[in-house]
Amino acid sequence: MSGLIQAAKSLLLLEFVSAFFLAMRQFFSPKPTINYPYEKGVVSQRFRGEHALRRYPNGEERCIACKLCEAICPAQAITIEAGPRGNDGTRRTVRYDIDMVKCIYCGFCQEACPVEAIVEGPNFEFATEMREELYYDKEKLLMNGDRWEREIARNILIDAPYR
């Protein structure tokens, strides 16, 4: 009996017909790709992109020069030099450099920071033609923080219950 069923399947080309209908169903289904750079995909709030230094609402930078991010960085991409902030004896960063060529975007610096000063923002479009442009200094990091502060604050607020 199984020989008769096998002969009927091969005579009627059932495998071919089922494969054809499968191909047609996939052909007319919506495409999962997007037309980048004209269309942007959705980025998760936990996405780890370009680094940024944040400021307090009064404009003062958040970094207290504790150097925890420098100590925990597995790629040794962060360099910090501390100096006195003012007459009150607190410290501030005189130099804060990140070598983005070395960075592996692990997020340890963001997790180690006690005041949420260094964060990895939502920006993933920072390609460059010059290697020197991937050495971020304090001014570049603060500029990134000012540019992306709304999105960064929203993402931290959304992710706060899970930390």
From Swiss-Prot:
**Chain segments annotated as coiled-coil in the UniProt record:** none
List where the protein spans the membrane.
none
Q: Which cofactor does it need?
A: [4Fe-4S] cluster
Q: How is the cofactor bound?
A: Binds 2 [4Fe-4S] clusters per subunit.
* Record has Cell membrane as a keyword: yes
EC numbers on record:
7.1.1.-
Entry superkingdom? Bacteria
Domain named 4Fe-4S ferredoxin-type is located at 53-83, 94-123
What this protein catalyses is: a quinone + NADH + 5 H(+)(in) = a quinol + NAD(+) + 4 H(+)(out)
Q: Which GO terms describe its molecular function?
A: 4 iron, 4 sulfur cluster binding; iron ion binding; NADH:ubiquinone reductase (non-electrogenic) activity; quinone binding
Location in or out of the cell: Cell inner membrane
UniProt keywords (A-Z) are: 4Fe-4S, Cell inner membrane, Cell membrane, Iron, Iron-sulfur, Membrane, Metal-binding, NAD, Quinone, Repeat, Translocase, Ubiquinone
> Some GO term, biological process aspect, for this entry: which one?
aerobic respiration
A GO CC term assigned to this protein in UniProt: plasma membrane
The family assignment reads:
Belongs to the complex I 23 kDa subunit family.
Question: What HAMAP family does UniProt report for this protein, alphabetically?
Answer: NDH1_NuoI (MF_01351)
**Name the UniProt record assigns to this protein:** NADH-quinone oxidoreductase subunit I
